[in-house]
């Protein structure tokens, strides 16, 4: 039959339109069956021919529409592919790695993969970020160019920032030069101003030391009179507190007087030794002077001290010194040997 031939004919159309077309054809078939039952056999060939013609025309129109739609879709798909490829080339590897890590994490957790809408939104976000970064970079370069133009190319470059606080600092090798300049250099042999009060050459001279000691000799008499007064007060007072205070003052004054006498005696020993060495060099018995060591100087001072004392004072001093040395030796002994003695 012509109807069966028309129905069996293959048509080029999309899946959705084909389903719609089959529904329409099925409806028309039902109508045709009803008309066939009601109409006579004479009218059947005319109706069949008309229906076949209509079906053929509809199929041709649908073929043309399908061709146009497929061409448009192919051009649109190629344009979309090119645009996507250009945009994907601009995406950094870091952003792609982050997206891949997030997708892999969600898959490990058992979450469902993102839909097309979500992927599209992520792509849009990446494009937006790239666009903003590009605009910001262009804006910064333009600002720098304008600043350089305004300043005449003499703007100070900003110091480079560190990637982290643990990274080494970058320092310029150009060091700032001081503003002070030596216009005229003074000659090397020019005399410099000096203060004689703090000049070591003046203060350390033996002549100055001798003159100072000679100028303040009255202090020795004053110290001796002070010691005599303290001894008289100590003999008269009976209050224990005052006696303790007077004893302390008397001991301090005597120690100070003894120290000054030792220093004076040491200076006398050194002066006599220098005079003796000078005399020997002058006589030709020596070519170079001999300088006393500290230990030798101490022995000479002690010898002179004992020579200046009387016989009774010397014996007392020697006895005190012997006891002092013995006590110092006992301190070094262990406790067992101390008990035996």
From Swiss-Prot:
GO terms for biological process: maturation of SSU-rRNA from tricistronic rRNA transcript (SSU-rRNA, 5.8S rRNA, LSU-rRNA). Disulfide bonds: none annotated. Residues 109-146, 232-286, 329-341 have a biased composition (Basic and acidic residues). InterPro entries: RRP36. Keywords: Coiled coil, Nucleus, Ribonucleoprotein, Ribosome biogenesis, rRNA processing. Residues 17-40, 48-70 have a biased composition (Acidic residues). Residues 116-150, 241-283 form a coiled coil. Residues 203-215 have a biased composition (Low complexity). Its main location: nucleus. Pfam families: RRP36. The keyword Coiled coil applies. Associates with 90S and pre-40S pre-ribosomal particles. This is rRNA biogenesis protein rrp36. The gene is rrp36.
């Amino acid at each position: 039959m012509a109807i069966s031939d028309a129905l069996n004919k293959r048509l080029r159309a999309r899946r959705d339109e084909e389903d719609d077309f089959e529904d329409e054809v099925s409806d028309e078939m039902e109508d045709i069956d009803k008309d066939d039952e009601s109409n006579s056999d004479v009218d059947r060939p005319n109706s069949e021919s008309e229906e076949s013609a209509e079906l053929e025309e509809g199929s041709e129109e649908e073929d043309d529409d399908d061709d146009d739609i497929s061409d448009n879709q192919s051009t649109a798909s190629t344009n979309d592919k090119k645009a996507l490829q250009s945009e994907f080339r601009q995406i950094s590897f870091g952003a792609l790695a982050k997206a891949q890590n997030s997708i892999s994490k969600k898959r490990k957790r058992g979450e469902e993969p993102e839909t097309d809408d979500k992927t599209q939104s992520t792509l849009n976000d990446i494009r937006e970020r790239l666009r903003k970064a590009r605009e910001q970079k262009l804006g910064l370069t333009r600002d720098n160019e304008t600043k350089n133009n305004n300043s005449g190319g003499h703007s100070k470059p900003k110091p480079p920032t560190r990637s982290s606080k643990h990274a080494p600092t970058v320092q310029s090798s150009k060091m700032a030069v001081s503003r002070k300049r030596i216009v005229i250099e003074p000659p090397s042999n020019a005399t410099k101003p000096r203060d004689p009060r703090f000049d070591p050459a003046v203060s350390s001279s033996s002549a100055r030391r001798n003159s100072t000691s000679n100028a303040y000799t009255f202090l020795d008499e004053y110290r001796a009179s002070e010691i005599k007064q303290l001894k008289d007060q100590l003999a008269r007072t009976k209050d224990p507190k005052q006696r303790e205070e007077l004893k302390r003052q008397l001991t301090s004054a005597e120690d100070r007087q003894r120290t000054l006498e030792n220093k004076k005696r040491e200076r006398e020993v050194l002066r006599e030794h220098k005079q003796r060495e000078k005399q020997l060099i002058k006589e030709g018995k020596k070519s170079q002077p001999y300088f006393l060591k500290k230990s030798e100087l101490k022995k000479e001072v002690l010898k002179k001290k004992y020579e200046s004392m009387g016989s009774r004072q010397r014996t007392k001093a020697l006895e005190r010194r012997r006891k002092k040395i013995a006590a110092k030796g006992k301190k070094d002994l262990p406790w067992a040997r101390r008990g035996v003695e």
